[in-house]
Amino acid sequence: MSETFEKKLSANPKTIAGYFHKLMQDWDEREVVELRFLGETRKPKNYRFETSQILKATNCVVEMNNRGLNAYAVVHPVLRQTPVSAKDADIKRAFFAYVDADEKGAADRVRESKLFIPEMEVITGTKPFLRNHIYFRFDEPMNDMLRWSGLQKCLIKKFGTDAAIHNPSRLMRIAGSVAYPSASKLKRHYRAEVTKLLIGGNYVE
């Protein structure tokens, strides 16, 4: 995280809550969402919340993000008794496949595809070019995480998206949080931006 972020930017609680509702809507009481807050030269901070604690999770994201930390969530559910931080072997089922279109032109390639109907889209930035995360919901949760990882690799190859996005405990940016670019990205004309959430073609804000 750069120390030169624009302090006037603030996380959007409605967008954050909308993201959590979509992410956690089919989880059971044994499962929690794991949040992680990261920044350059800053100690990582981890928190977990149950499906009944979306308001608390949202408030946590707003507080930590407004301190200048980037906000992420493990997309897949984490069992309550799992030690912090969750590892790939700790993830037992997946409700989504998703892609991280962080290279120039990748976001439009995914948007234009008719391969899947997106469940939601997180717009992670527009400067210096459009970047997004697009999520595709399964009809039934996938319990074979090796198969899930293989599917992720197929999506990466299909769309030319971030090649690292295939491990089950992968962190993804939380919609509605401010994305603070690193010092190196600032030099490449990235800017701090409030991330957006699109569901059914409509912004949640």
PLM features: what roles do these ranges have?
Residues M1, T15, E119-M120, Y190:
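N-terminal cationic amphipathic segment used for targeting or macromolecule association
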Residues M1-F96, R170, V178, K196-I199:
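DNA replication initiation on ssDNA origins
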Residues R36-L38, D100-D102, T124-T126, G176:
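Short loop/turn segments at strand-loop or loop-helix junctions that form parts
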Residues D26-E29, N59-L69, E112-M120, I156-D162:
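Structural alpha-beta junctions
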Residues R42-K43, K127-P128, L186:
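Intrinsically disordered, low-complexity coil segments
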Residues E121-H133, M172:
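Short, conserved phosphate-binding/catalytic loop or strand-edge motifs used
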Residues V84-A86, P118-G125:
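N-terminal accessory/precursor segments of enzymes
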Residues H76-K114, F138-E205:
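DNA replication initiation modules
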